[in-house]
Amino acid sequence: MAEAVWSTDTGEAVYRSRDPVRNLRLRVHLQRITSSNFLHYQPAAQMGKDLIDLATFKPPQAASGHRPDEEEEEEVIIGWQEKLFSQFEVDLYQNESACQSPLDHQYRQEVLKLENSGGRKNRRIFTYTDSDRYTDLEEYCQKITTSAGEAPSFLVERMANVRRRRQDRRGVEGSKLKSRIITWEPSEDFIRNSHAINTPLQTMYIMADLGPYGKLGYKIHEHVLCVLKVDSNGVITVKPDFTGIKGPYRIETEGEKQEHTSAWKYTIDNVSSLAQPEEEEREQRVFKDLYGRHKEYLSSLVGTDFEMIAPGALRLFVNGEVVSARGYEHDNLYVHFFVELPATNWSSPSFQQLSGVTQTCVTRSLGMDKVAYFSFPFTFEAFFLHEDESDESLPEWPVLYCKVLSLDFWQRYRVEGYGAVVLPVTPGSHTLTASTWRPMELGLVAELRRFFIGGSLELEDPSYVRIPGTFKGERLSRFGFRTETTGTVTFRLHCLQQSRAFMESNSLRKQMRSVLDRLEGFSQQSSTHNVLEAFRRARRRMQEARESLPQDLVSPTGTLA
């Protein structure tokens, strides 16, 4: 007797498909392993004439019209989420009092139709769809007690069917539920455990009733043949994998009596209909046209040519953020900010908004200070064009002004401070802190007025924090102007600079340290290059003249006669 080769690899396999999952078809073949099955493995040459053909002995037909050999071997083709009823479900749903949900009543109607049409075609193989309340307890459930006879309750079965993000949930942040929504200093374990993707899954179980002949319809004899899981991304998980060229899978059941113990083998094959060549060509054309249109759409957004600016010009693009304000006297702070461009050589597009106002923010205590976190983003761009080449002064740079205000219960505001920072000259990420101050009046009455009814001294021109752009004199005097130092405002700026001067690759350009040096030297590039070239030619002529002289005149040891 030859030995059958069983497949022991029951692990899951993962497939990806762009086709609709409703086209999936599986062929499941189930057969009981008996001594007569192994006769097929023996060569025909070994079969003598004296041997009796076992196939001539036909088992008797049962009263139900089915012979035992029909229940020992079965083959069905199952589609995705196709419902095949078991004998237990047929007996259950024939009783109307056992139907509790609308799905149970629907199954009852289907069972009655099957009975009227001659009964179900399947005998042992059946399915549980995603809508059924079935859970593979061996895969999901964890026993609560150490008892070997523990049976899961209805609630345990239902809860085990719920997909949890983290089954091992250790370390609850905070003393009670939702006590800390934001973790300011997350640990590496917290980040790793929290970074989970919850993708919805649809599950289908292909089952088999492996009970002895004449005793079908008992839950204890139900066994899982295959588990199918499909998510919204087209990922199909099959456990165990399709049989293919491997041997069949094997299941052994144990019963109270020796005749109830049996072994079964089954195979799972993918018999989904393949697409016709015409359909594949049409699908490829559709995808090619779709990708082409998407590429044209992206090209229309980006443009065909890289946007260049005029020679000698600089484009400054700033992605900024008002991060926080700290050290102020009152609560409910907000910041009014604007960017001032120098009057000469600087400009900005007409659609650009160079000012903004943050939201009102409540402060929180951080050490000895109160901090208001705004995280307010803003963006702008400006252009610098060095037109006057005769002007040897360094170009001015844009300035970011800010005005911090507070709001009280009666919606009255008071000025908390003025500040300003010069935008960074070099590109990259920068964090700047603006120290602020506010004008003040002498006397207790002014402070009481500011505290109770709001209002305080304000600057008519906020640029007075630095040197105003309208000032034309040589010296700016602030003598007698009383101020009080207040808190600080933190800005985070990401600066991008674009200029044709960055394309210069000669040694002179590499030695320049900032964009100001580049722009200042851009208009003098040709003259500098001419001077260096004339110096090289003069040095070359001097070397040629030196080589043409006699060696005794060139040698330092030569003497006159």
Swiss-Prot record:
This is Tectonic-like complex member MKS1. Residues 314-442 form the C2 B9-type domain. Component of the tectonic-like complex, a complex localized at the transition zone of primary cilia and acting as a barrier that prevents diffusion of transmembrane proteins between the cilia and plasma membranes. Involved in centrosome migration to the apical cell surface during early ciliogenesis. Required for ciliary structure and function, including a role in regulating length and appropriate number through modulating centrosome duplication. Required for cell branching morphology. Keywords: Cell projection, Cilium, Cilium biogenesis/degradation, Cytoplasm, Cytoskeleton. One of its GO terms (biological process) is regulation of smoothened signaling pathway. It comes from Rattus norvegicus (Rat). InterPro entries: C2_B9-type_dom (IPR010796). Part of the tectonic-like complex (also named B9 complex). Interacts with TMEM107. Interacts with TCTN3, AHI1, TCTN1, TCTN2, CC2D2A. Interacts with FLNA. Interacts with TMEM67. Interacts with B9D1 and B9D2. GO terms for cellular component: centriole; centrosome; ciliary basal body; ciliary transition zone; cytoplasm; membrane; MKS complex. It is found in: Cytoplasm, Cytoskeleton, Cilium basal body; Cytoplasm, Cytoskeleton, Microtubule organizing center, Centrosome. PANTHER family: B9 DOMAIN-CONTAINING, TECTONIC-LIKE COMPLEX MEMBER MKS1. Disulfide bonds: none annotated.
